[in-house]
């Protein structure tokens, strides 16, 4: 990766109606992993769709976490509330927005 580039992991889950609060408790990690720089939770209101966006310092950090027992436990805790899931990993950079 080049300087000023980050690894972005985006996961989208459609959850069962009425389970958002339970899902959210299961989804939040017990400890935030080394290498995770930022994390966002986005909810698409009435569609029961939750998008997680995490920013990582390297592909290795993200992969280490993905394969960890903490992530396995978290995924197992979320499973009863999830109908569908998809995810992708991207390398990106922050765009500088001009300020007038």
Features from the language model and the residues they span:
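Short S/T/G/P-rich N-terminal loop/turn motif that feeds into the first structured element of a domain
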Residues: 1-72, 77-100
